[in-house]
């Protein structure tokens, strides 16, 4: 019995899921030129391939779609310092990625992204790239202005007036507002965050859903998923690597095709609700905690799928 439980927890079941016939996997993604917000989601925060994809797609958008603004699920103020760095500011690339605000970005892949932007700007002084953060979770500055007693009193009153603060709804609402503020300064912007934040549909009003409701935003979203992920995650004060299977029939079909990477146009999918992988900065062994059961055709305009994705290495 113990062995069966171990097998179930490792694979997330006693099979690797279903597959779908007749899917056309492409090697290149074509992003419509009239879109103003192009969003890329990542199924996890702990895999190299999803971080590499940020750079690959951004390069394409710079070269083919005229995009010059990059925005990430990172600290708003810290990313202003990153923007200074890519415009020739002092410091190192590692120091710059640390300013984004989360350890998940302290990787070689993110450093490569920042280096590309800095190098680009050095040779394109009149056509530069800008870097933005649109998250709003940093509140340490409050400690300098208010006592713990004052902060707790204010929070209690605010929550009494607005119960929405007890959920992720407010965070996504403000992230959407921040992206729209960025868009007011830019012709187009490339937005990177977790799948759940950029999706056009979900169990709550996500940033992506709010942005997609306004036609003038020209919202286009690319989701990602994996068949098997060896994911870098925090656990009891350290980083560990754990293996997860998504049970996504699309990625299983990709595996059966012999490819490791494939791109699909979701409008051509003949599937509705399916399992997909979804990991944040935490996990449980039960499959329901790292899988979602949702309709990819409604959530995304396109998807980049991987069979195997490998763990990031966090640089201290």
PLM feature spans:
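Structured catalytic-domain cores with a bias toward divalent-metal coordination
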Residues: 8-316
């Amino acid at each position: 019995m113990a062995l069966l439980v171990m097998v179930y927890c490792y694979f997330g079941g006693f099979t690797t899921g279903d597959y779908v016939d007749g899917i056309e996997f492409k090697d290149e993604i074509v992003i419509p030129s009239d879109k103003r917000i192009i969003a890329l989601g990542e199924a996890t925060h702990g895999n190299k391939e999803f971080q590499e994809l940020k750079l690959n797609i951004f390069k394409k958008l710079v070269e083919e779609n005229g995009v010059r603004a990059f925005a990430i699920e990172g600290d708003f103020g810290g990313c202003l310092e990153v923007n200074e760095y890519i415009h020739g500011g002092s410091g190192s690339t590692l120091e710059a990625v640390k300013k984004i605000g989360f350890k998940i970005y302290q990787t070689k892949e993110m450093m490569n992204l920042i280096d590309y932007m800095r190098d680009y700007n050095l040779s394109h002084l009149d056509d530069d790239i800008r870097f933005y953060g649109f998250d709003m979770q940093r509140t340490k500055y409050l400690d300098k202005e208010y006592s713990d007693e004052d902060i707790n009193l204010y929070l209690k009153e605010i929550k009494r007036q607005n119960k929405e603060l007890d959920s992720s709804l407010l965070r996504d609402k403000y992230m959407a507002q921040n992206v729209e503020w960025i868009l007011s300064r830019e012709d187009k912007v490339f937005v990177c965050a977790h799948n759940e934040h950029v999706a056009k549909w979900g169990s709550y009003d996500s940033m992506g859903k709010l942005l997609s409701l306004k036609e003038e935003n020209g919202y286009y979203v690319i989701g990602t998923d994996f068949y098997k992920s060896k994911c870098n995650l925090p656990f009891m004060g350290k980083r560990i690597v754990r293996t997860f299977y998504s049970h996504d029939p699309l990625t299983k079909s990709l595996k059966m095709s012999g490819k490791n990477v494939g791109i699909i146009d979701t409008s051509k999918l003949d599937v509705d609700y399916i399992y997909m992988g979804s990991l944040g900065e935490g996990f449980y062994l039960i499959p329901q905690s790292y899988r979602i059961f949702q309709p990819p055709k409604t959530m995304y305009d396109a998807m980049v799928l991987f069979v195997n994705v490998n763990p990031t290495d966090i640089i201290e």
